[in-house]
């Protein structure tokens, strides 16, 4: 834990939870009929609910318990799943659903935080009688412009602007605390909210018109708690533990201050439109506060966008999602940019802004997906605790207590289902469906694909060598290159050899099997060779840094020259060439894709699952782009994907019909 580390943590981790004061109290007041209908008991109970929700779900569950469950220093729901996935097969379900819910939140957080911040400008005078932002349409235009700029700059990375995140968020939290203290004044009776009795009492009190549905608004105070866990790998456990007390105190003071201001201004009009956060700020600094709030909202949105990129990259590694083009704007592997994800996030976020139009409507959708992710994380945490400590009463009480709390919040969020909650759920289900199809489609294919099993490449080297010298077959290419994942330097998918040997035998001077391995270093450019004691069967393991372009065509030509030079393989002199002395022949690259065979005997559901998985593969990253083969001679071959038990019904032979005795023959 260092001062610099604490500052970085404040800038990266707390953006989402740090912007919650912008809309939590506003949502509670609107749900109870407006500012002129609330009383002291409601406000004290509300703040008590907020403080104890943040204490239990953020401080206890996340900071005290979840931060212990790191995977080589990395946190988050997928890192947690990776720790326990061998324990039980069903654990993949909470991991998939929770991950999908967090990705869904990545579209909602930028929409609601930026819109809420900009709404503070509405009705604000710039000079005498000049009100440039007088309606919601203007708010939407400004919000969309900010979001467009935010998503457009992602390709450049956040290394430079990211240095400002810490100082800006430090000022933001200090501002929250100071504004809270100013509005508390001498009204220290508000500290009664520290007593959880008032939180429980509020849920059953008649002056709480929203009933248990109030929890849907209260939960907004702890959205962003999952970031403390998922970002632990970026900023370090010690820096999160050290910075959280400061953040918690500043948030608490601001909620106290809003509560006092509300009770001192219950006679105001515009009952449901008042935002106590902005209203309690003195007019002479309100514009500055809106600018600061907008910056905090942008930083919160940036954190969610960056987190979404990281989550998708982890999903790809766990085979929850198909392969995508991942770029690295800086020399640090943690700084990634996924164009497809950025485009989908940007389009969805702006569509949500246009659909809901106001932050009040967005708040109805916001929160539901996070309650889902928190519940699934609780389940996975319990399994991790059992794995580490065994079954005991403490672990059982943990899962019962926190699952009950999360289910209560989920139920209250579902009360807003028809008012916008369905949007959050639909986005979550859509993402989860893609994950389910890809993950279980792969499972079905691997478990039932006898024809796609791995075989030993060294057992086929003699056959490949003989084919290379067999004049009965025309030369298909001088160098036939298969992009194949060769495991342990010798195991290769049978479908690759099927393509060479069974599908019109392909004669070549040299057969190349290339595996691309991405390393944790940014600029690695190395290769290893295994020829299996031959001159024309070569397994190449490429080791490329995560910032290196995967230009297999360029690298392979250099490798061929190196191997010819040291006599590892034979030269390939060319009789007809524009380059005198050329000793390397042509290259043909082959990508093998699966196509479901009609002989597949799987159940209808499993067959549909594999077909859907193949369709997703076709829609994902083009192999030519992935391997840098856009200008190479490349073919994509389809091989039959035969799944399930093969049952070939025998056909019975009969004697031919004797037409000599028919009337047709007599004519």
Swiss-Prot record:
PANTHER family: OSMOTIC STRESS POTASSIUM TRANSPORTER, POTASSIUM TRANSPORTER
Similarity-based family: Belongs to the HAK/KUP transporter (TC 2.A.72) family.
Function: Transport of potassium into the cell. Likely operates as a K(+):H(+) symporter.
Topological category with respect to the lipid bilayer: Multi-pass membrane protein
Catalytic reaction annotation: K(+)(in) + H(+)(in) = K(+)(out) + H(+)(out)
Organism field: Lactobacillus delbrueckii subsp. bulgaricus (strain ATCC 11842 / DSM 20081 / BCRC 10696 / JCM 1002 / NBRC 13953 / NCIMB 11778 / NCTC 12712 / WDCM 00102 / Lb 14)
Protein name stated in the entry: Probable potassium transport system protein Kup
Chief subcellular location: membrane
Key word Cell wall biogenesis/degradation present: no
Keywords: Cell membrane, Ion transport, Membrane, Potassium, Potassium transport, Symport, Transmembrane, Transmembrane helix, Transport
GO MF annotations in UniProt: potassium ion transmembrane transporter activity; symporter activity
Record's subcellular location: Cell membrane
InterPro entries, per database record: K+_transporter (IPR003855), K_trans_C (IPR053952), K_trans_N (IPR053951), Kup (IPR023051)
Annotated TM spans: 5-25, 47-67, 88-108, 133-153, 164-184, 210-230, 243-263, 287-307, 336-356, 367-387, 393-413, 420-440
GO cellular-component term (any): plasma membrane
């Amino acid at each position: 834990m260092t001062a610099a580390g604490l500052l970085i943590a404040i800038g990266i981790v707390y953006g989402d939870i740090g912007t919650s004061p912008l809309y939590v109290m506003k949502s509670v007041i609107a749900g109870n009929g407006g500012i002129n209908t609330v009383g002291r008991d409601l406000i004290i109970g509300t703040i008590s609910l907020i403080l104890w929700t943040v204490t239990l779900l953020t401080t206890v569950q996340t900071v005290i318990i979840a931060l212990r469950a790191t995977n080589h220093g990395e946190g988050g729901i997928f890192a947690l799943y990776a720790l326990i996935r061998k324990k039980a097969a069903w654990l993949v379900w909470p991991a998939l659903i929770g991950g999908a819910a967090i990705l869904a939140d990545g579209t909602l957080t930028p929409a609601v935080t930026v819109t809420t911040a900009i709404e503070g400008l509405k009705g604000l005078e710039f000079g005498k009688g000049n009100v440039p932002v007088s309606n919601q349409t203007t708010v939407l235009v400004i919000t969309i412009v900010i979001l467009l700029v935010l998503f457009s700059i992602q390709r450049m990375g956040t290394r430079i602007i990211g240095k400002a995140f810490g100082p800006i968020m430090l000022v933001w939290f200090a501002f929250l605390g100071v504004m809270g203290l100013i509005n508390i004044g001498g009204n220290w009776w508000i500290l009664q909210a520290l007593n959880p009795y008032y939180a429980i009492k509020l849920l059953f009190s008649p002056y709480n018109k929203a009933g248990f549905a109030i929890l849907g608004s209260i939960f907004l105070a702890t959205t962003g708690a999952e970031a403390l866990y998922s970002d632990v790998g970026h900023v370090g456990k010690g820096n999160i533990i050290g910075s959280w007390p400061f953040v918690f105190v500043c948030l608490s003071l601001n909620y106290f201050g809003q509560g006092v201001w509300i009770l001192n201004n219950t006679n105001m009009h515009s009952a449901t439109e008042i935002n106590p956060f902005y209203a309690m700020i003195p007019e002479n600094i309100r514009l500055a506060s809106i600018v600061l709030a907008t910056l905090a909202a942008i930083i919160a949105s940036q954190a969610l966008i960056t987190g979404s990129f990281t989550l998708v990259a982890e999903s790809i590694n766990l085979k929850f999602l198909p392969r995508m083009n991942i770029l690295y704007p800086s020399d640090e592997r943690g700084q990634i940019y996924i164009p497809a994800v950025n485009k989908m996030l940007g389009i969805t976020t702006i569509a949500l802004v246009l659909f809901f139009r106001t932050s009040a409507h967005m708040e109805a959708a916001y929160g539901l997906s996070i309650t889902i992710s928190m519940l699934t994380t609780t389940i996975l945490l319990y399994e991790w605790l059992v794995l580490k400590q065994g079954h005991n009463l403490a672990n059982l009480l943990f899962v019962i207590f926190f699952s009950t709390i999360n289910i209560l919040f989920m139920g209250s969020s579902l009360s807003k289902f028809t008012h916008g909650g369905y949007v959050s759920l639909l986005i979550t289900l859509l993402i989860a469906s893609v994950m389910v199809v890809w993950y279980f489609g792969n499972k079905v294919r691997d478990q039932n694909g006898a024809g796609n099993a791995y075989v030993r490449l060294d057992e086929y080297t003699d056959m490949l060598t003989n084919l290379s010298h067999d004049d009965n077959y025309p030369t298909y290419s001088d160098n036939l290159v298969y992009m194949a994942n060769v495991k342990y330097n010798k195991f290769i998918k049978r479908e690759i050899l099927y393509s060479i040997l069974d599908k019109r035998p392909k004669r070549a001077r040299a057969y190349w099997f290339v595996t691309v391995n991405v390393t944790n270093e940014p600029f690695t450019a190395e290769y290893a060779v295994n020829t299996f004691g031959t001159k024309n069967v070569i397994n190449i393991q490429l080791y490329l840094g995560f910032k290196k372009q995967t230009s297999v065509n360029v690298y392979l030509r250099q490798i061929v020259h190196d191997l010819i030079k040291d006599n590892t393989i034979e030269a390939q002199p060319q009789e007809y060439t524009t380059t005198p002395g050329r000793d390397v022949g042509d290259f043909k690259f082959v990508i093998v894709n699966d196509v479901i065979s009609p002989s597949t005997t799987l159940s209808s559901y499993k067959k549909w699952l594999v077909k859907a998985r193949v369709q997703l593969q076709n829609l994902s990253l083009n192999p030519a782009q992935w391997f840098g083969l856009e200008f190479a001679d490349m073919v994509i071959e389809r091989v039959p994907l035969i799944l399930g038990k093969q049952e070939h019904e025998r056909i019975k032979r009969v004697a031919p019909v004797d037409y000599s005795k028919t009337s047709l023959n007599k004519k």
